[in-house]
Amino acid sequence: MRIGVPKEIKVLENRVGLTPESVREIVAHGHDVVVERDAGQGIGMSDDDYRRAGASVLATAADVFDAAEMIVKVKEPQSSERRMLKPGQVLFTYLHLAPDPEQASELIEGGAICIAYETVTSATGGLPLLAPMSEVAGRMAVQAAAHYLEKAHGGKGILLGGVPGVDPGKVVVLGGGVVGTHAIHIALGMGAEVWVLDRNVDVLRRLWTQFGRPLNTVFSTRDAIERHVATADVVIGGVLVPGAEAPKLVTRDMIASMQPGSVVVDVAIDQGGCFETSHPTTHAEPTYVVDGVVHYCVANMPGGVPRTSTFALNNATLPYVLALATKGWKAALTGDVHLRNGLNVAAGKVTHRAVATALKCKYVPAEAFLAS
């Protein structure tokens, strides 16, 4: 199979779909790889690095899309990229379709085979291709919050970890999954007072065992969210319903109850966000203020540390890329229920139930599509 890697064009997105190291593995398995010129520049990889790994370097994204049977990206295809996709061409990337009907509509009309990293599952019930970026985003969320708590950036002027004789900041983490776990790790490491809210008591037990008494665990209810948000210096939203829009856990009234200069970081913004006041921002303009509260809602947070993120992502995606290329997409999906769960849109049909529900589209089970 010929695999194409275009340069990412989302605002300040410097990750790349495949590293030279991954390219070398793919080529060793008998496949061809074409890479757009300067695609790896943001992670410090030159065109010559890709050539040495066995890839061909093409001048434009159009050349890559035209040549490839499968496109491997990082972020959802932008409008110009969607127009270059061909019927039957495989797209393997993050899609986050639930809150993005425009993208979904164009992918449905285009007829491509669209496999989303974020809904591929594992035998243990995890999301193996979302997890590495959730790890990065959870850690970055605390770093960003600490930065924007500084007075010069609109915050309260609080040092998150405090100093001897002065209280630390209070960090409230909504959701104890991968994002939440890594946010807790960094926040505790910085010396903050940390509270985590989750509706799964087993998750709270796991976190209690992992982090011990410095972490405060709370069963999540509306009352608990209201109470802890109102007294928080930082709230980090890390909730997820795979494929679906994120639930709006924090209302406008809750935001208004926070002290001016507090910071909220919505890591769930890719799936629509879990704060009622959230809307997507970019690394170029990462924040805005509502009711005196600083909102950080960058939709591609890991793109801010592209080298770390790209290598972490490739560690997870490479086996799936090889499976799709070696077996062909149809056989690979038919033989692996977990990879099949990544199929969101195929030849004009919506094949993921949560995505179809969010978009109010007809749902065609992936199994039925593959059997047709």
Language-model segments: residues:
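Glycine/serine-rich phosphate-binding loop and adjoining beta1-alpha1 elements at the start
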Residues: R2, E8, S79-K170, V298-N300
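An N-terminal-biased, well-structured beta-alpha scaffold segment characteristic
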Residues: R2-E106, G110
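General beta-strand structural signal in soluble alpha/beta enzymes
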Residues: V5, V34-R37, V57-A59, F65, ...
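Glycine-rich phosphate/diphosphate-binding loop of Rossmann-like nucleotide-binding domains
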Residues: P6-M45, A152-G237, T287
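Short glycine-/small-residue-rich Rossmann-like dinucleotide-binding loops
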Residues: E69, K75-E76, L95-H96, T221, ...
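Adenosine-phosphate binding glycine-rich loop
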Residues: E118-L159, I269, C274-S372
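Rossmann-like adenosine-cofactor binding region
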Residues: T209-D291
